[in-house]
């Protein structure tokens, strides 16, 4: 029988754990140049970087964000979001 590795590879975790209901904004440097940015308008709206948006749902490495504007909810990688302060 093979023994489990004594030194498991650590998994990458975001610096701040984002949970449902958190107020967030998009980190500009993480977002620009990403796949999500290239699939969207070339000039993203400023309100996503200013915040706050509410994190409605978390699935895997993505979160659904609702902005306090009459716009559709969006799915973004959690690594592109930061806590609004």
Curated annotation (Swiss-Prot):
Belongs to the complex I NdhO subunit family. GO terms for cellular component: plasma membrane-derived thylakoid membrane. HAMAP family: NDH1_NDH1O. Its EC number is 7.1.1.-. Coiled coil: none annotated. It catalyses: a plastoquinone + NADH + (n+1) H(+)(in) = a plastoquinol + NAD(+) + n H(+)(out); a plastoquinone + NADPH + (n+1) H(+)(in) = a plastoquinol + NADP(+) + n H(+)(out). NDH-1 shuttles electrons from an unknown electron donor, via FMN and iron-sulfur (Fe-S) centers, to quinones in the respiratory and/or the photosynthetic chain. The immediate electron acceptor for the enzyme in this species is believed to be plastoquinone. Couples the redox reaction to proton translocation, and thus conserves the redox energy in a proton gradient. Cyanobacterial NDH-1 also plays a role in inorganic carbon-concentration. GO terms for molecular function: oxidoreductase activity, acting on NAD(P)H, quinone or similar compound as acceptor; quinone binding. This is NAD(P)H-quinone oxidoreductase subunit O. It comes from Synechococcus sp. (strain CC9311). It is an enzyme of class 7 (translocase). NDH-1 can be composed of about 15 different subunits; different subcomplexes with different compositions have been identified which probably have different functions. It is a peripheral membrane protein. It is found in: Cellular thylakoid membrane. Keywords: Membrane, NAD, NADP, Plastoquinone, Quinone, Thylakoid, Translocase, Transport.
């Amino acid at each position: 029988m093979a023994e489990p590795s004594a030194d498991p590879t650590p998994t990458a975790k975001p610096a701040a754990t984002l949970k449902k209901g958190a107020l967030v904004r998009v980190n500009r440097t993480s977002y620009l140049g990403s796949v999500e940015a290239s699939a969207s308008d070339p000039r993203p709206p400023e309100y996503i970087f200013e915040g706050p948006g509410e994190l409605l749902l978390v699935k895997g490495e993505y979160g659904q964000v609702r902005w306090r504007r009459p716009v559709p909810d969006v799915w973004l990688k959690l690594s592109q979001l930061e806590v609004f302060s």
